[in-house]
Amino acid sequence: MASIAPSLKRAHAPLRKALTASSTIRAFATVPPTSSETTKPKRKSYFKDTTVAEFSDFLATSSPAQPLSPAEAFTLRTAEVGPEGKKRTITRLPEWLKTPIPAGNDNFKSIKKDLRGLGLHTVCEEARCPNISECWGGSDKNAATATIMLMGDTCTRGCRFCSVKTNRKPAALDPHEPENTAEALARWGLGYVVLTSVDRDDLADGGAHHFAETIRRIKQKKPSLLVEALTGDFRGDLDMVKVVAESGLDVYAHNVETVEDLTPYVRDRRATFRQSLSVLKHVKEVKGKEGIITKTSLMLGLGEQEHEVMAALEDLRKADVDVVTFGQYMRPTKRHLKVEKYVTPDEFEMWNKRALDMGFLYCASGPLVRSSYKAGEAFIENVLRKRSGEKAMARGTLAKAVALDSETRSSI
């Protein structure tokens, strides 16, 4: 018995220690917080305290933007917002990212009304594009552009930069959509249209035949309308790429979105950089002799390095891609990837020059440029320049290009 007692004593020691400390714990629980505890600031979160932009940040000022020094360009301004006692610090958008509110001109109103009436969707609205009023309005009626989103508004993929809804089993395809889309576009009097779609991995063909049928209906109703198809990768099924490429479109676009190393982090895991390259390359193999234009787009500001962008451009040229666009990545919501950097206009101009020097037919590069931004003006101007034998340029007006083309044809 004498040998057991010490072991029991050791076994009960932790319990006695806990019981002794319990009164202290209860005492701490009833002590009111001190003044220093009540005034202790809340831990900052990245979204609320660093990246949230106010509505006013998206409005352009009446005065023209002033040139910024390098130090000013990389130092973003902050502001205190909110009621007294609940103030928070936000980072304001750079001046070059501010846009005017949609003015609602006749083209804009007509397009929006018809979309609602025919139950059609546009990526302009679903992806919250900042250029919607400029593209839907157009510099004149024939220069207006619109981007119709086919096959519904719900995607089967979940890319970390995109604000489009996602679901494994979206609604069934609307069999009337090809005809309704063609009817709307013929009515609007546009000069150029971009057709895009959500990814439909739930369909055996990825929606390729639905896409192709829509293009054929459009060309039947209005052969003069230039059609660009911005497609997904069809899970790498090149036969489905061929179906769309042979449907009568003028421009085949597929976006690589970002550099190769960031692709697994930015895009859905079912998409790869090399798979996207194979799509663009196959289009040229199928319809290259007929002069089809291929196009892609990259977002900047996701953390990419300069040498990675150069490597992406080199790969795109090897795939014989004709047109490339660069734009600033803008975070749609707090659930999406954060902006790593706001790229300055000078840097976008640098990439514009480099792309043209590498042999791309055309490059649109700027903070607010999107894959289909001013698609009609960019395409028409540069194809007409090429037709006239003049080197493709990054600047110029649609009117000048049309006049140049008319002079060339009259002299033949």
Swiss-Prot record:
Pathway: Protein modification; protein lipoylation via endogenous pathway; protein N(6)-(lipoyl)lysine from octanoyl-[acyl-carrier-protein]: step 2/2. GO terms for cellular component: mitochondrion. Its main location: mitochondrion. CDD domains: Radical_SAM. Belongs to the radical SAM superfamily. Lipoyl synthase family. HAMAP family: Lipoyl_synth (MF_00206). This is Lipoyl synthase, mitochondrial.
